[in-house]
A protein has these predicted regions:
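Active-site beta->alpha loop and helix N-cap motifs at the rims of alpha/beta catalytic domains
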Residues: 2-3, 9-16, 21-24, 28-111
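Catalytic alpha/beta core domains of metabolic enzymes, predominantly
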Residues: 110-134
């Protein structure tokens, strides 16, 4: 197995610093980290991150909690850059499994980072839904 290091940060100065490190293979963030870093507009802040890391994968998380808005956000995020991965939680804040959206986005060849997985059972559910070649 080959280990890859991804930084889970949102501060632009730290992203610039760690983007120069060969050991760092990509970045992941979420709306909470971005707010703490001073982001006022999710899209414009995300695009700043993507422009800094244009040669490494960057996972940007949807912040909607329902299927319709989550899909809308995922489709938008997917258009922002070639190196973007759409980060989708395995369950929403009500504990509802987000399998439907994960399956749909995966079937459209949208690169996904499925987050907040806490058990082998959750992993098994995802593996039954996705095309493992994507």
């Amino acid at each position: 197995m080959k280990t890859k290091i991804f930084c889970d940060i949102a501060e632009l100065n730290l992203i610039k610093k760690f983007n120069k490190k060969k050991i760092v293979k990509g970045f992941t963030t979420n709306p909470s980290l971005m707010r703490k870093a001073g982001a006022k507009d999710y899209r414009s802040y995300s695009k700043k991150i993507l422009s800094i890391c244009n040669n490494k994968p960057v996972s940007l998380e949807v912040f909607a909690d329902d299927y319709v808005n989550m899909k809308k956000q995922a489709m938008q995020i997917n258009t922002w850059a070639k190196n973007v991965y759409v980060k989708v939680p395995i369950a929403n804040s009500k504990g509802e499994f987000m399998g439907r959206i994960i399956k749909e986005l995966n079937s459209q060849n949208i690169k996904l980072n499925i987050t907040a997985i806490y058990s082998a059972k959750q992993t098994e559910k995802i593996l039954k839904l996705i095309n493992k070649k994507t």
